[in-house]
Amino acid sequence: MEVVTNGSMHFDPQIHTLPFVRARSSFLLAVILASASAFTALGGTRQLHLSLRAHADRLEANVRNSHLKSIEIIQAFLCLATWAEVPTILCRDRTWSYVSHAISLAIELRLDQPLPHCIQSDPMYDQGYNELLIRNAHRTCLLLFIHDRVGIILTYVSG
């Protein structure tokens, strides 16, 4: 997780440790592992990447079908949007789907609030992680805004 948290604006190295991510969201963990396995310098192979990506896709379908909501799920969709493979055909680009679903989850969880309810009800909130969890929610909300704006700008530029 150290490699991921040091080079990514998505995660906070103080809370996004391997035990934290493992305990909170198997979907986020699978997405991180699938994204990291795409880079052979980190020890990934093509077969490993395909297996992890297929697992992440199965978990994504489960998350959507079960209507699950959490900040970690939003972060997983942001990672999928950020590290998505460039499709050979534009109609296969799923970035818009990842970002739009993440935005709808953020709206439902009210991440734009100064103190989102999902943070107040978090078991870690009472364990001294208040500021880190609030900052995590606000960072996620800001990244969604950036993804949305960049997508609109690219749409205007490209056509």
Where are these regions (language model features)?
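Acidic, Ser/Thr/Pro-rich intrinsically disordered transcriptional activation regions
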Residues: 1-80, 88-91, 103-108, 112, ...
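Fungal transcription factor middle regulatory core
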Residues: 104, 109-159
